Curated annotation (Swiss-Prot):
GO terms for biological process: ERAD pathway; lipid droplet organization; proteasome-mediated ubiquitin-dependent protein catabolic process; response to unfolded protein; retrograde protein transport, ER to cytosol; stress granule disassembly. Residues 176-251 form a coiled coil. The keyword Lipoprotein does not apply. GO terms for molecular function: lipase binding; lipase inhibitor activity; protein-macromolecule adaptor activity; ubiquitin binding; ubiquitin protein ligase binding. Identified in a complex that contains SEL1L, OS9, FAF2/UBXD8, UBE2J1/UBC6E and AUP1. Interacts with YOD1. Interacts (via N-terminus) with UBQLN2 (via C-terminus). Interacts with PNPLA2 and UBAC2. Interacts with ZFAND2B; probably through VCP. Interacts with LMBR1L. The gene is Faf2. It comes from Rattus norvegicus (Rat). Residues 200-262 are annotated as: Disordered. Residues 258-340 form the UBX domain. CDD domains: UAS_ETEA, UBX_UBXN3B. It is found in: Cytoplasm; Lipid droplet; Endoplasmic reticulum. Residues 204-249 have a biased composition (Basic and acidic residues). Plays an important role in endoplasmic reticulum-associated degradation (ERAD) that mediates ubiquitin-dependent degradation of misfolded endoplasmic reticulum proteins. By controlling the steady-state expression of the IGF1R receptor, indirectly regulates the insulin-like growth factor receptor signaling pathway. Involved in inhibition of lipid droplet degradation by binding to phospholipase PNPL2 and inhibiting its activity by promoting dissociation of PNPL2 from its endogenous activator, ABHD5 which inhibits the rate of triacylglycerol hydrolysis. This is FAS-associated factor 2.
Amino acid sequence: MLPFRFTYYTILDIFRFALRFIRPDPRSRVTDPVGDIVSFMHSFEEKYGRAHPVFYQGTYSQALSDAKRELRFLLVYLHGDDHQDSDEFCRNALCAPEVISLINSRMLFWACSTNKPEGYRVSQALRENTYPFLAMIMLKDRRMTVVGRLEGLIQPDDLINQLTFIMDANQTYLVSERLEREERNQTQVLRQQQDEAYLASLRADQEKERKKREERERKRRKEEEVQQQKLAEERRRQNLQEEKERKLECLPPEPSPDDPDSVKIIFKLPNDSRVERRFHFSQSLTVIHDFLFSLKESPEKFQIEANFPRRVLPCVPSEEWPNPPTLQEAGLSHTEVLFVQDLTDE
């Protein structure tokens, strides 16, 4: 029986090899690599049971990437469906409890049938010679490298010993890579911390400079505002002085003391000083206001009050008095004492 099986599988392999030159292998077109993995896993469990190493449920490239990132060994199993030793290897070796324990605890396990496009693609990369085929892959010298190949039927104890030997022989590379990676990470963290400290210092300096600029701008605006207020006050005083001079120039001549229609008025100013002047009965009270306004001692804004009876004289036009009355109409006598009330701050 054994010679017949050997002859059968040998002829089958020769036929498949020759067929490659006649037409392209349909397995070379990978369209659903994850589907290939899941399909193989289901067929494996249907044939050999659910007690097996944990399959990596992803593409070969993803398995390589994860093993590289996690710094773990990656065990690749390529299953030859038609090979005479595949069934015995899967049942007796790959699914042995001690083998399962070793694989699950110390490595990632990726497997696929070479009849699947994804498995066939990987077999073209690893170039196995026979089945069962196992390849141990790890990060070595910063690239994923095959560090061990197991081909042909193997017993559980030998499988464990050889896998352990391969891992022990190459463990130093992983340790070295871990140390280098930790050093790179520490360097990166240190650089990041330095960058963050630099950025924090830069932001603090920028904030200080911003506050300085704002303070300079605030002072500049304040000085400009003070200067504008000063100029405005100077213009106001100049305008006021010019207005006083105009009022003074427009005042009618003071009547003589002998004029029977003249009125002698004594003004008591807010600073307790007194001013005396004569006016004509026929003149408007506005003349009195203009006279007082032209005086240097007078406040800028004021009203004129009579004492008997106590009242405010309508010396400037208003809604009630559009045309202020004359001195006579206001009821003033030949001699009067009037009080100047300061209204500047009101």
